[in-house]
């Protein structure tokens, strides 16, 4: 029965299409894009036993486990209900097949657990709610309450336009983007997305707990009178959507929200900006489309009176900070010309030393700029204590193309320097002495470039000498 189902056209046709467009991109012998289908828990236990923990890993898992322990203690559910849930998640973390997805999503699970526990935290543990700070900052920074300005004129068409990004796309698009990153991004990119998305929301909830602030709808309903935790929330402009559709989609949910006074920072803005940053990283050609989506959601949050503009800026800054940390710490490079995850034969990450202008290993972007190239060589020579001159390898960039669209890989030289194009200031006698050391043949692109290699140049060489030689 099972074999007949697998052989049916309903299963075979999608598999053939998936194999044609995705699996056919995989290079023979490459395993970097493979998934782990092992279900033996002993495999994970052996890895855990021999794993050497770094300081970052200890802080990462210690921080998340401490929050989960707080949730376990505070959440008012029976121990016999919480224990099976913990055991189920522990099993998913130990099975290799599921742990490759559940473990990177641990920040997301921690954020969700803390969010739904906020309403159960005793009120005496919570700080006072601020009502005047956000509208005052809005007026000081931007001259007016932008949320009230945008919500002055309301129509059914504008309500629908604001409802789509705020009430529909916001809750569904993270799952769509995760699938897109898994298919079209490099291997391990989905782990980075789970880390960044989870930590951004987790830190945002912690800030909302430490700094509870009333949203614009509170000022419209209660003015600037003091707020307390016994008050119910409001759907704001989304209440008009419930009346328009005749369905209670948001009124009850927002009235009994876990965090009613969580205006700052806006996690709607934070999630949106995080999604836009990953989309710009994955598909940079469509930046205008992604930025348009972010502007659309920003407008909807203020039109529906759920956030001030300063809340949106706070969420965006939080998202940008977490993304930049993830980008330079965990996120692999997205190579142009590669179609999907199965097109990759190796995983490369950003080397901060190569993009830092003050670093010894800095590589100028414009290799044809003689002045910047000369300055880099002189600066590097001044940092090297040994008097011997290092070999001058040419820099290469590997440009990988998908096998089904182009069968071979091309090598693109980044430097046009040859033995006949020497830097002024090097004597011919020095060249003859170094003839035995410097090879005229091009180094192999499969060999690692020596980290200590620099361009040899005289310390007396300057930009003026370069200009005089040209004349």
From Swiss-Prot:
**Matching CDD domains:** PAP2_Aur1_like
| Disulfide bond residue pairs | none
| Segments passing through the bilayer | 55-75, 78-98, 101-121, 169-189, 192-212, 259-279, 282-302, 305-325
UniProt feature, compositional bias: Polar residues: 399-422, 451-462
Please list the GO terms describing molecular function.
inositol phosphoceramide synthase activity
Question: What Enzyme Commission number does this protein have?
Answer: 2.-.-.-
Q: Which domain of life is it from?
A: Eukaryota
Under Pfam families, the record lists: PAP2_3 (PF14378)
The residue ranges for the Cytoplasmic side of the membrane come to 1-54, 99-100, 190-191, 280-281, 326-471
Which residues fall in a compositionally biased region of kind Acidic residues? 427-437
Q: Specify whether Ligase is a keyword of the entry.
A: no
Q: What class of enzyme is it?
A: transferase
Keywords, A to Z, come to:
Glycoprotein, Golgi apparatus, Lipid metabolism, Membrane, Sphingolipid metabolism, Transferase, Transmembrane, Transmembrane helix
Q: Which GO terms describe its cellular component?
A: Golgi cisterna membrane; inositol phosphoceramide synthase complex
Carbohydrate-modified residues: 145, 228, 256
Q: Which SMART domains match?
A: acidPPc
Query: What compartments host this protein?
Result: Golgi apparatus, Golgi stack membrane
Lumenal compartment ranges equal 76-77, 122-168, 213-258, 303-304
Tell me the segments the record calls region Disordered: 398-471
GO biological process annotation, one example? sphingolipid biosynthetic process
Report the principal subcellular site: Golgi
**Membrane-related topology note:** Multi-pass membrane protein
User: According to the UniProt entry, how is activity regulated?
Assistant: Inhibited by aureobasidin A (AbA), khafrefungin and rustmicin.
**PANTHER family attached here?**
INOSITOL PHOSPHORYLCERAMIDE SYNTHASE CATALYTIC SUBUNIT AUR1, PTHR31310
Its biological purpose is as follows:
Catalyzes the addition of a phosphorylinositol group onto ceramide to form inositol phosphorylceramide, an essential step in sphingolipid biosynthesis.
The molecule here is called Inositol phosphorylceramide synthase
Question: What species does this protein belong to?
Answer: Candida albicans (strain SC5314 / ATCC MYA-2876) (Yeast)
Q: Which gene encodes it?
A: AUR1
């Amino acid at each position: 029965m099972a074999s007949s189902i697998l052989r049916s056209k309903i299963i075979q046709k999608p598999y053939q299409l998936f194999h044609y467009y995705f699996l056919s991109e995989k290079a023979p012998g490459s395993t970097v894009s493979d998934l782990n289908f092992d279900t033996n828990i002993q495999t994970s236990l052996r890895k855990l036993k021999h794993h050497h923990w770094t300081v970052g890993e200890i802080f990462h898992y210690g921080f998340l486990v401490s929050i989960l322990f707080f949730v376990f203690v505070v959440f008012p559910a029976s121990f016999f209900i919480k224990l099976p849930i913990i055991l189920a998640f522990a099993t998913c973390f130990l099975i290799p097949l599921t742990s490759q997805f559940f473990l990177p999503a641990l920040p997301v699970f921690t954020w969700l657990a803390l969010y739904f526990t906020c309403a159960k935290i005793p009120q005496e543990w919570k700080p006072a709610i601020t009502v005047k700070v956000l509208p005052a900052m809005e007026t000081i920074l931007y001259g007016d309450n932008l949320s009230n300005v945008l919500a002055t004129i309301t129509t059914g068409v504008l309500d629908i336009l604001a409802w789509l990004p705020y009430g529909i796309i916001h809750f569904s698009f993270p799952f769509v983007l995760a699938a897109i990153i898994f298919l079209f991004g490099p291997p391990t990119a989905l782990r980075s997305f789970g880390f960044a998305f989870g930590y951004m929301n987790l830190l945002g909830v912690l800030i909302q707990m430490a700094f509870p602030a009333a949203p614009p709808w509170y000022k419209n309903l209660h003015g600037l009178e003091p707020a307390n935790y016994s008050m119910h929330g409001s759907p704001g402009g989304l209440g008009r959507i419930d009346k328009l559709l005749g369905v209670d989609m948001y009124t009850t949910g927002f009235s009994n929200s876990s965090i009613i006074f969580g205006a700052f920072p806006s996690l709607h803005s934070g999630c949106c900006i995080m999604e836009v940053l990953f989309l710009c990283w994955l598909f940079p050609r469509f930046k205008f489309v992604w930025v348009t989506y972010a502007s659309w959601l920003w407008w909807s949050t203020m039109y529906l009176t759920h956030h001030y503009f300063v809340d949106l800026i706070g969420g965006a800054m939080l998202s940008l900070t977490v993304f930049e940390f993830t980008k330079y710490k965990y996120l692999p490079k997205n190579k142009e010309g590669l179609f999907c995850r199965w097109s990759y034969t190796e995983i490369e990450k950003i080397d901060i030393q190569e993009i830092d202008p003050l670093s010894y290993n800095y590589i100028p972007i414009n290799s044809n700029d003689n002045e910047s190239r000369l300055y880099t060589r002189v600066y590097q020579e001044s940092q090297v204590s040994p008097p011997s001159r290092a070999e001058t390898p040419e820099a290469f960039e590997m440009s990988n193309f998908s096998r089904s669209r182009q069968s071979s890989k091309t090598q693109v030289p980044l430097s046009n320097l040859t033995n006949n194009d020497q830097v002024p200031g090097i004597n011919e006698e020095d060249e003859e002495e170094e003839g035995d050391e410097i090879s005229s043949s091009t180094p192999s692109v499969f060999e690692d470039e020596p980290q200590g290699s620099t361009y040899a140049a005289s310390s007396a060489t300057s930009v003026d000498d370069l200009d005089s030689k040209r004349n």
